[in-house]
């Protein structure tokens, strides 16, 4: 009888370990499958690419390795790489027509990606604000109103027009878009000085501070990311993308508005909804003592409700 109990105990113990081992094996297989599906392999550096109509070749070791670094970086910056594509679905439909209207190549929209991560509320520690990250003085010099009450660096359309003015001016000076991009980071005075000192005509051939040197290659890497996210290991569904929320109407304002909370209620929206749609309104009132003309967007409150069946995909490459 004792032997029977002992043998039964051994069998039960063997059965337990067999079941436990099989469960561990199944967990390991699932884990291996998960990592196999989510492990990112950076895309290879291409032989060349076209950016804003200019052909850049990567057959020189320094150019190739600088590009490789940024491709690797964007492959593993999961949070930012995911967010910028989600946000682009909402913002690019607004930005692209403005660039086209002002004669700026479409590829220059990627400046916004590396400047602000496509966050319209972005404010750097240095004081640069909005999608295009204008400093106060620079914003004013390109036609933006910047003060405590109104800050048009946060106005998506007006700041994009201002960016177009800067880019067109810089292109007139340099004649190639990669040098224009470098000047957006390093300033026109700084880049012009380096070109003169080093006897070059293209910023890709300059010895620059690390940030500006990397900036140009980050720009090209971002273009590759947006053209084919899957190559970087990122996949999206329609439900993942942020929908464009159009304004229900635009209100022309030429007089002061003492209370924007009341103004919002009169137009059927909350103060928070009004502010989200008009980030350039920095206070709870609009002074406008000079009776300038402002366009205040009244959001479509129904469009703010999440309905993926109505989401328009701006670029089909993002969900393939």
What positions do the PLM features span?
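Primarily a LysM-type cell-wall glycan-binding module
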Residues: 238-268, 292, 319-320
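Substrate-binding/active-site groove segments that recognize
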Residues: 126-147, 160-162, 167, 191-194
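Catalytic and binding regions of secreted/periplasmic enzymes and modules that target cell-wall glycans
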Residues: 167-194
């Amino acid at each position: 009888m004792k032997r029977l109990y002992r043998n039964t105990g051994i069998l039960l113990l063997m059965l337990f370990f067999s079941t436990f081992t099989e469960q561990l094996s199944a967990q390991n297989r699932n884990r291996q499958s998960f990592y196999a599906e989510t492990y990112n392999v950076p895309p290879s550096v291409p032989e060349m690419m076209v950016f804003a109509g200019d052909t850049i070749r990567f057959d020189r070791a320094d150019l190739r390795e600088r590009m490789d670094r940024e491709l690797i970086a964007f492959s593993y910056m999961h949070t930012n790489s995911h967010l910028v594509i989600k946000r682009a679905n909402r913002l690019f439909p607004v930005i692209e027509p403005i660039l086209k209207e002002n004669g700026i190549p479409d590829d220059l929209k990627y400046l916004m990606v590396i400047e602000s991560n496509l966050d319209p509320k972005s404010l750097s520690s240095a004081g640069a604000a909005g999608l295009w990250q204008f400093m106060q003085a620079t914003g004013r010099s390109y036609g933006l109103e910047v003060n405590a009450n109104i800050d048009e660096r946060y106005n998506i359309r007006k700041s994009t027009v201002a960016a177009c003015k800067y880019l067109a001016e810089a292109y007139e000076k340099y004649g190639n878009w990669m040098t224009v991009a470098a000047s957006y980071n390093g300033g026109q005075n700084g880049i012009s000085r380096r070109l003169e000192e080093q006897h070059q005509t293209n910023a890709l051939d300059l010895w620059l501070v690390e940030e500006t040197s990397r900036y140009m290659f980050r720009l090209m890497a971002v273009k590759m990311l947006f053209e084919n996210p899957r190559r970087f290991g990122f996949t999206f569904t329609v439900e993942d993308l942020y929908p464009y929320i159009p304004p229900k109407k635009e209100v022309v304002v030429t007089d002061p508005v003492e209370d924007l909370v009341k103004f919002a209620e009169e137009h059927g929206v909350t103060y928070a909804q009004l502010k989200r749609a008009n980030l350039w309104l920095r206070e709870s009132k609009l002074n406008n003592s000079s009776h300038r003309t402002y366009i205040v967007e009244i959001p479509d409150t129904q469009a703010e409700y999440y309905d993926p069946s109505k989401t328009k995909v701006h670029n089909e490459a993002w969900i393939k």
